[in-house]
Amino acid sequence: MAIERTLSIIKPDAVAKNVIGQIYSRFENAGLKIVASRMVHLSRADAEKFYAVHAARPFFKDLVEFMISGPVQVQVLEGEGAILKNRDLMGATDPKKAEKGTIRADFADSIDANAVHGSDAPETAAVEVAFFFPEVNVYSR
């Protein structure tokens, strides 16, 4: 497998629960390196731009409202098969359907407040990483 980078967001619900460190431990224990990280409180404009791919979907307005409801922790994860590995760690979008031991099963409350976001493909990962982190702010190690 190739070394990949993927974007991960710890959403407002998980930040409010003070579980950032526990989630970071899961990334690192799975062999993923955190090569960029920052906390940000998204503006409405930034949330709408980031999730523009979902603009026509019925959940778009609620998603934007949720994502601007509090700070988020945004990070770039790097490692072999990072995109799939992160998605496996996250679990199913609906925490009720997520496997026991996944981030969403352990920390999410609902399909809306589902603790984390992760890029779903190499193309989206590249766009999402660039949205939050100019290349000069990502450090391979």
Swiss-Prot record:
It is an enzyme of class 2 (transferase). The active site is at residue 117. Homotetramer. Disulfide bonds: none annotated. One of its GO terms (cellular component) is cytoplasm. ATP binds at residues 11, 59, 87, 93, 104, 114. InterPro entries: NDK-like_dom, NDK-like_dom_sf, Nucleoside_diP_kinase, Nucleoside_diP_kinase_AS. It catalyses: a 2'-deoxyribonucleoside 5'-diphosphate + ATP = a 2'-deoxyribonucleoside 5'-triphosphate + ADP; a ribonucleoside 5'-diphosphate + ATP = a ribonucleoside 5'-triphosphate + ADP. CDD domains: NDPk_I (cd04413). Belongs to the NDK family. Its main location: cytoplasm. Its EC number is 2.7.4.6. It holds the Pfam family NDK. It is found in: Cytoplasm. This is Nucleoside diphosphate kinase. It comes from Paraburkholderia phymatum (strain DSM 17167 / CIP 108236 / LMG 21445 / STM815). Major role in the synthesis of nucleoside triphosphates other than ATP. The ATP gamma phosphate is transferred to the NDP beta phosphate via a ping-pong mechanism, using a phosphorylated active-site intermediate. One of its GO terms (biological process) is GTP biosynthetic process. One of its GO terms (molecular function) is ATP binding. Keywords: ATP-binding, Cytoplasm, Kinase, Magnesium, Metal-binding, Nucleotide metabolism, Nucleotide-binding, Phosphoprotein, Transferase. Its cofactor is Mg(2+).
